[in-house]
Amino acid sequence: MADIEGLLHEVADAVISCKKEKVLEAVEKARAEVPPEEIIEKGLSAGMNQVGVLFERGKLFLPHVMMAADAMTTGVKLLEADLPAGAEKKLGVIVNGTVEGDVHDIGKSIVSTMLQSAGFEVHDIGRDVPIRDFIEKAKETDADMIGISALMTTTLQGQRDVIELLKEEGLRSRVKVMVGGAPATQAWADKIGADCYAENASEAVAKAKELLL
């Protein structure tokens, strides 16, 4: 029997290399010995998490992340047929965007990519998003969580405004709120009544799982 840990390691490394062919090859090799859920969680997702860490350390750039996510998705698609019925159920629905007045996109995009890779259904509504649009999208998608990014101190208030509007609409008890972005902190999240603060993409995935699973 092949070394399962070694096979999963190969899958993770293939994702980090951002090469689809490598991922397909490694997944094909692993599926003979390893259950599909395990390949997704301990191979593909583990590799993607590592990509997130490397991105945060400045060792990889956004194009690499997008290519790795693409390569990972190819691997997941290959395994879909092997998954037991219902196994591909999404972990939860998340609306993610950057508040109005803020045109920064990169951090938020990587968070969306990582959440998607972890198995959440993510609706990325982009940057410079009006407060009401967060709420409307959450209603439309029946979201479990809203992720609000702000990259400037001047736009931080938008995070509070989304929470206030959720309360006004009677949705606050049903929809969790995660805040992030350079000027955001845990103290700020506590002050405005957010459910959690995430410093980076890996943390965003961990916190989302904590709150929604």
From Swiss-Prot:
InterPro entries (alphabetical): Cbl-bd_cap (IPR003759), Cobalamin-bd (IPR006158), Cobalamin-bd_sf (IPR036724), Corrinoid_p (IPR012741), Dimeth_corrin_MtbC (IPR048095), Met_Synthase/Corrinoid (IPR050554), Meth_synthase_dom (IPR036594)
Could you tell me one molecular function GO term of this UniProt entry? cobalamin binding
List keywords of the entry alphabetically: Cobalt, Metal-binding, Methanogenesis, Repeat
Please name the pathway: One-carbon metabolism; methanogenesis from dimethylamine
| CDD domains noted in UniProt | corrinoid_protein_B12-BD
Keyword presence, Phosphoprotein:
no
The entry's methylcob(III)alamin-binding residues are 104
Output the SUPFAM superfamilies linked to this UniProt entry: Cobalamin (vitamin B12)-binding domain, Methionine synthase domain
The B12-binding N-terminal domain extends over 1-91
GO biological process, alphabetically ordered: methanogenesis
All copies of the B12-binding domain together span 92-213
Family of the protein in this entry: Belongs to the methylamine corrinoid protein family.
Function description: Acts as a methyl group carrier between MtbB and MtbA.
Q: What is this protein called?
A: Dimethylamine corrinoid protein 3
UniProt organism field: Methanosarcina acetivorans (strain ATCC 35395 / DSM 2834 / JCM 12185 / C2A)
Taxonomic lineage from the root = Archaea, Methanobacteriati, Methanobacteriota, Stenosarchaea group, Methanomicrobia
Name of the gene encoding the protein in the UniProt record:
mtbC3
